[in-house]
């Protein structure tokens, strides 16, 4: 039900403001969202503010029992969602048939049997949506929207490190009067709440964004029940800078490595720069990197804290590995200490040169504000080197020559290649990775196909009874 006065926008703003105004660890504990009701869990866990390194709110530590309750609510709601008036369903069926005809140029009426064939897309059922911590609202919404449009009901499992955003979003669904049980959310750790969602026999589909290690386990577990799976996993994204690149693009190239502290799966972490401009480029790039302001994200800064202490230690470890492997650290590379946030997890943009392609910092996903720059000579050489890792999520190419751009893009093994730009997203285009970076594609048509099952219906109009 909507709020009594219909003024849900003001109520929604008040919920957010209360979160902002509450001192660390003094806000009331958060709750799961099951069948349009905010339900207290069996137990809570601390959510840590990475800017200060201190707990700031308690969130549910979701159990298998709570996941089961959310799935049961979604399963029950699916019966109602499927109960569409016959006239509306007929309209959908023949609209699909017309769309199929227009897109394939095939006649519907077969001369021999006078049959009409059309394709109907049915919702799959209960969808399990497991989203990561780095872009918590965007990446959850990117899954939620097509899943709901296709007619599914959902159980969301946001990262336990950034569950507050999803909790606020659930308030929006409740305030606007979304049908009971269509959208549900369970917070908690992946090894408990997430694992139960993957294993549940009434969850027919899993959409996951996260690490390659966890994604491969989800794929293995889901295969036992033949569930549909979409996996958007890790990356070690290359950027290729040709000697004739536009120098005005240097700021965008740096941004492609350090936006959101480098905690975006699409960030550039390996830069291949053509030899004639290598030294000049590194100098200009370091100057750009040093312009990024590191600080508490409540102020006007470009680089905030690493998401967690564990992740912060991981990034620091890779920087130490780079030093031990003979890498040259041009900037960053050390903990940044901030007044009032001495225990926060801050690392300044770090630029490294002098590492071979086989080094860990050139092959492993670091997922932080760390980039390795290395020279190359020819297009053939750099394409082979860029494709040499086990990942294939995205890449960037920078050149003033259109043929050079397109020839390189065509040879790169990546789900998305940006030419003279970065993160320019057209949401109708397929999105996903190659190799160890993912399975499946999402985005408009691809999402609707993933979140639905295609059914072919053949009707013999010539039959007489």
Language-model segments: residues:
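Rossmann-like NAD(P) dinucleotide-binding subdomain of oxidoreductase/dehydrogenase enzymes
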Residues: 103-248, 300, 376
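ALDH superfamily catalytic-core signature
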Residues: 213-356, 419
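Residues at or immediately preceding the N-termini of alpha-helices
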Residues: 50, 64-67, 246-250, 278, ...
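Short, structured beta/alpha segment
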Residues: 2-82
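Residue-level signal for inorganic ion chemistry
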Residues: 53, 91, 151, 183, ...
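Conserved residues at the C-terminal ends of beta-strands
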Residues: 130, 189, 209, 256, ...
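Long amphipathic alpha-helix in the N-terminal Rossmann-like dinucleotide-binding domain
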Residues: 65-68, 72, 82-103, 115
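Conserved C-terminal structural/oligomerization subdomain of aldehyde/semialdehyde dehydrogenase
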Residues: 2-3, 51-57, 203, 240, ...
């Amino acid at each position: 039900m909507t709020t009594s006065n219909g003024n849900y926008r003001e109520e929604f703003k008040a919920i957010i403001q209360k979160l902002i105004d509450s001192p660390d660890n003094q806000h009331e504990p958060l709750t799961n969202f099951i069948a349009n009701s905010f339900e207290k869990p069996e137990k809570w866990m601390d959510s840590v503010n990475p800017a200060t390194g201190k707990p700031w709110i308690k969130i549910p530590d979701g159990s298998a029992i709570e996941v089961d309750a959310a799935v049961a609510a979604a399963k029950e709601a699916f019966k109602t969602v499927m109960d569409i008036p016959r006239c509306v369903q007929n309209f959908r069926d023949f609209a699909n048939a017309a769309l199929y005809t227009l897109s394939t140029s095939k006649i519907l009426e077969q001369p021999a049997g006078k049959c009409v064939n059309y394709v109907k897309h049915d919702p799959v059922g209960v969808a399990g949506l497991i989203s990561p911590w780095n872009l918590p609202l965007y990446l959850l919404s990117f899954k939620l929207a097509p899943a709901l449009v296709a007619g599914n009901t959902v159980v969301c499992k946001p990262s336990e490190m950034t569950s507050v955003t999803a909790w606020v979003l659930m308030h929006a669904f409740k305030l606007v009067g979304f049908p009971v049980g269509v959208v549900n959310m369970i917070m908690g750790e992946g090894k408990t709440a997430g694992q139960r969602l993957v294993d549940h026999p009434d969850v027919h589909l899993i959409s996951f964004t996260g690490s390659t290690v966890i994604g491969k386990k989800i794929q293995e577990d889901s295969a036992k029940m033949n569930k549909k799976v979409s996996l958007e996993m890790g990356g070690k994204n290359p950027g290729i800078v040709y000697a004739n690149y536009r120098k005005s693009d240097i700021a965008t190239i740096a941004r492609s490595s350090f936006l959101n502290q480098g905690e975006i799966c699409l960030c550039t972490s390996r830069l291949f720069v053509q030899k004639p401009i290598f030294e000049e480029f590194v100098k200009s790039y370091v100057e750009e990197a040093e312009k990024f302001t590191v600080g508490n994200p409540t102020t006007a800064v470009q680089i905030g804290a690493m998401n967690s202490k564990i992740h912060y230690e991981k990034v620091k470890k890779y920087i130490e590995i780079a030093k031990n492997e003979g890498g040259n650290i041009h900037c960053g590379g050390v903990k940044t200490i901030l007044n009032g946030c001495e225990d926060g997890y801050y690392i300044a943009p770090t630029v490294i040169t002098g590492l071979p392609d086989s080094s860990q910092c050139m092959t492993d996903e670091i997922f932080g504000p760390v980039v390795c720059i290395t020279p190359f000579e020819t297009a053939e050489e750099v394409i082979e080197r860029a494709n040499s890792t086990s990942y294939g999520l995205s890449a960037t190419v920078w050149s003033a020559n259109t043929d050079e751009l397109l020839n390189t893009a065509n040879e790169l093994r990546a789900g998305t290649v940006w030419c003279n730009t970065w993160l320019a997203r057209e949401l109708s285009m397929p999105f996903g990775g190659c190799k160890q970076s993912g399975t499946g594609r999402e985005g408009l048509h691809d999402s609707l196909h993933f979140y639905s099952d295609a059914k072919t219906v053949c009707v013999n109009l010539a039959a007489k009874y």
